[in-house]
C-alpha cells in the first residue's frame, strides 16, 4: 500500500471491486480519513447511479465501519500493497430483529416437523407427525385450516413461488397438493415414490408462469417431476444408488439432487437426462442450497408486498432473479455427513470451487443469504458457521447452542441469521458484529423447524413440544 502526504492529509492507494472481483476503475488514492460514507458517495459516482444507493464495504471479509486510516493502524496492514475494498449494495430496507414470542399456537397432536411461510409472507404452513398439514392466519395468529389427506408423518412442505399452491410430502411417500385459500386437497394424493419424501422444490416462476411443475426427492433413490395440472408424475429421475436426501430446481432450469451415494447429480427437465455429476464428498449429502434461493422462493413478490397481475409476474420474477444473480454463475453449496461442505459453480465446472472445512460433526443444513453474499451452515457440533458466499472463505463461528443445530434461516435483508436447535432455543445472530443478537427460549423441547418470513416481519418455529411459536420484533 502506498501512502503519501498531500494537502488534505495522508492518502492510501485503494482498489474498489464488487463481490465477484470486478474492478471499479483502476487503483486510486483516497484520503485515509475516508470512511463508509465517503466510499458510498464514490461508488455511486463511479456507477452513475441516478439516486444514492446504500453500500457496505469489506476488507478481507471484515466490514469496514471506520475510516480507512483507522483500519490500517488497528490491523497493522503492510504499507507495501494496494488495499482492496469490496463494495456490496445493501438492501434498501431493514428488518427488525425479532425479540419476543407474539403467540404460541397449539393444534398439532404430534411434533411439528416442517414449517414454511408463503412467498408473500401472508400465510404459514406446518407439517406434523400427526399426519396433517395446517394453515395459519398470520393476522389473527390463529389456525385457518387443518388439511387431512396424508396417512403418515408430514416431513416437508413447499409453496409454489406464485403462492397459489402448497405441496406436502410424507413418510409413506405420497404427495398432497393443497389449495391454500381453501385448505382443500387438489385431487387425490400423488403416488409413485416407494419411500419417504425428503425434499420438494418448485420450478422457478421466471421460467414458467403460472407454476405447474415441482420436483420431489425420496429415500427410494429417485427424484420425480410432477405436473400439478395433470396431477401426475411426468418424469422419474433415476440414477442415484442410495436415498436422495435433497433437491433444488435452479434458476437456469437445471435440477440438482444430493444423495447418500455421496454424489450430486444435475438433470435437464424436458426429458430428465443426467447432465453432470458432482463428486467429492466422502459421506452422505444432507443439504443443498442455491445462491439465488431467496428470489426463486419469492418469485415476483418483493419486500414492498406489491401484487403483480399474472401476465407481469414472470417478467418481474425474471428481473429479480437477474438482479440477484448478476453476471456470475449460480452457485451451489452442499453439506455432508463427512463434516465438510463444498462450494460449486455447476454450470462452469464439475470441480468444486472450494472445500469448506471446520465443523467437527455432520453438517445438517446449509443456506445462502438472500443477497448471495453469505453461506450459513448448521451442524451437530452445536455451532453455526458463516462463510463468504462467493469465495467460500471461512468468516466466523457462532457458538451458543448447547445441542445440535437443526436448521437456519435468514432475514430478508441478509443482516440477521436465525438458528433452531435440539437445545429447545432459537438464536438470532447479527452478521455485522458476528455476535448473538437475541436468545429466544420458550419451547419445551427440541426445535426441529424454523423459518423467517420473506417480508421479514415474523419468525416461526416448531418442534417436539407440538406447538408453533410466532416471534416478532
Curated annotation (Swiss-Prot):
PROSITE patterns named among the record's database cross-references: WD_REPEATS_1, WD_REPEATS_2, WD_REPEATS_REGION
Family matches, as SUPFAM superfamilies: WD40 repeat-like
Gene name, Swiss-Prot/TrEMBL: NLE1
Motif position, DWD box: 417-432
Location(s), subcellular: Nucleus, Nucleolus
WD repeat residues: 107-146, 149-188, 192-236, 239-277, 313-354, 358-399, 400-439, 442-473
Source organism of the structure: Arabidopsis thaliana
Protein name per the record: Notchless protein homolog
Domain notes from UniProt: The DWD box is required for interaction with DDB1A.
Tissue: Constitutively and ubiquitously expressed.
Protein family (similarity comment): Belongs to the NLE1/RSA4 family.
Pfam assignment, any one: NLE
Amino acid at each position: 500500500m502506498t501512502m503519501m502526504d498531500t494537502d488534505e492529509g495522508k492518502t492510501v492507494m485503494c482498489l474498489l471491486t464488487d463481490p465477484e472481483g470486478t474492478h471499479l476503475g483502476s487503483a486510486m488514492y483516497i484520503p485515509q480519513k475516508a470512511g463508509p460514507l465517503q466510499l458510498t458517495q464514490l461508488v455511486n459516482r463511479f456507477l452513475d447511479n441516478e439516486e444514492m444507493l446504500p453500500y457496505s464495504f469489506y476488507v478481507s471479509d471484515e466490514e469496514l465501519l471506520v475510516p480507512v486510516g483507522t483500519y490500517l493502524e488497528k490491523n497493522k496492514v503492510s504499507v507495501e500493497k494496494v488495499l482492496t475494498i469490496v463494495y456490496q449494495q445493501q438492501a434498501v430496507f431493514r428488518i427488525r430483529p425479532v425479540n419476543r414470542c407474539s403467540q404460541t399456537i397449539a393444534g398439532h397432536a404430534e411434533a411439528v416437523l416442517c414449517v414454511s411461510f408463503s412467498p408473500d409472507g401472508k400465510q404459514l404452513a406446518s407439517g406434523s407427525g400427526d399426519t396433517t398439514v395446517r394453515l395459519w392466519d398470520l393476522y389473527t395468529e390463529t389456525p385457518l385450516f387443518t388439511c387431512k389427506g396424508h396417512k403418515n408423518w408430514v416431513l416437508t412442505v413447499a409453496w409454489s413461488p406464485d403462492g397459489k399452491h402448497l405441496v406436502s410430502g410424507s413418510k409413506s411417500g405420497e404427495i398432497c397438493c393443497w389449495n391454500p385459500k381453501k385448505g382443500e386437497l387438489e385431487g387425490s394424493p400423488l403416488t409413485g415414490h416407494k419411500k419417504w419424501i425428503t425434499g420438494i422444490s418448485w420450478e422457478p416462476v421466471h421460467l414458467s408462469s403460472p407454476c405447474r411443475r415441482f420436483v420431489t426427492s425420496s429415500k427410494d433413490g429417485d427424484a420425480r417431476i410432477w405436473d400439478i395440472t395433470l396431477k401426475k408424475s411426468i418424469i422419474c429421475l433415476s440414477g442415484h444408488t442410495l436415498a436422495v436426501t435433497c433437491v433444488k430446481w435452479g434458476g437456469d432450469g437445471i435440477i440438482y439432487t444430493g444423495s447418500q451415494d455421496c454424489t450430486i447429480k444435475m438433470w435437464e427437465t424436458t426429458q430428465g437426462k443426467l447432465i453432470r455429476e458432482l463428486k467429492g464428498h466422502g459421506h452422505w449429502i444432507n443439504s443443498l442450497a442455491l445462491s439465488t434461493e431467496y428470489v426463486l422462493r419469492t418469485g415476483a413478490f418483493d419486500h414492498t408486498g406489491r401484487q403483480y397481475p399474472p401476465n407481469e409476474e414472470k417478467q418481474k420474477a425474471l428481473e429479480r432473479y437477474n438482479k440477484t444473480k448478476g453476471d456470475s454463475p449460480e452457485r451451489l453449496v452442499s453439506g455432508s455427513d463427512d463434516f465438510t461442505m463444498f462450494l460449486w459453480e455447476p454450470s462452469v465446472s464439475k470441480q468444486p470451487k472450494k472445500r469448506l472445512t471446520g465443523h467437527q460433526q455432520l453438517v445438517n443444513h446449509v443456506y445462502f443469504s438472500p443477497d448471495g453474499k453469505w453461506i450459513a451452515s448448521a451442524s451437530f457440533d452445536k455451532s453455526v458457521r458463516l462463510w463468504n458466499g462467493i469465495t467460500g472463505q471461512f468468516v466466523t463461528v457462532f457458538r451458543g447452542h448447547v445441542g445440535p443445530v437443526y436448521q437456519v434461516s435468514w432475514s430478508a435483508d441478509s443482516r440477521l441469521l436465525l438458528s433452531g436447535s435440539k437445545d429447545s432455543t432459537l438464536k438470532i445472530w447479527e452478521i455485522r458484529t458476528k455476535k448473538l443478537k437475541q436468545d429466544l427460549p420458550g419451547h419445551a423441547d427440541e426445535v426441529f423447524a424454523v423459518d423467517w418470513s420473506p417480508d421479514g416481519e415474523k419468525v416461526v418455529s416448531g418442534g417436539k413440544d407440538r406447538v408453533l411459536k410466532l416471534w416478532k420484533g
